[in-house]
Amino acid sequence: MIEVARLYRVDNISSVKAFVDVVIGQVLVKGIRIVEGKNGLFAGMPKSQGKDGKWYDTVRILDDELKQELQDRILEAYNV
C-alpha cells in the first residue's frame, strides 16, 4: 500500500514543483520531487551528491508496476 504522507508545494521558477514523503508498507521515503519535465510532470526519487559532484539516487524502485503505482499516487495527490 502506498500513502502520500506529506506534500509540500514549492512556489518558485524551478522545474521542481513540490516535495513529497510517501509510506510504502512500513517504509517512509522522504524527499521525492515532483518535477516539470519536457513530457509533463514526473516523480523524481531522492538524490544525494557524491564526492565527484555527480548526483545519485538514494532510493530506487526496481519493480516497474510498483514504480508506476507510486508515480500515479504522487501525481494524483499533487493534482488535487
Show which residues each predicted segment covers.
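Single-stranded nucleic acid-binding surfaces, predominantly the OB-fold ssDNA-binding core
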Residues: 1-80
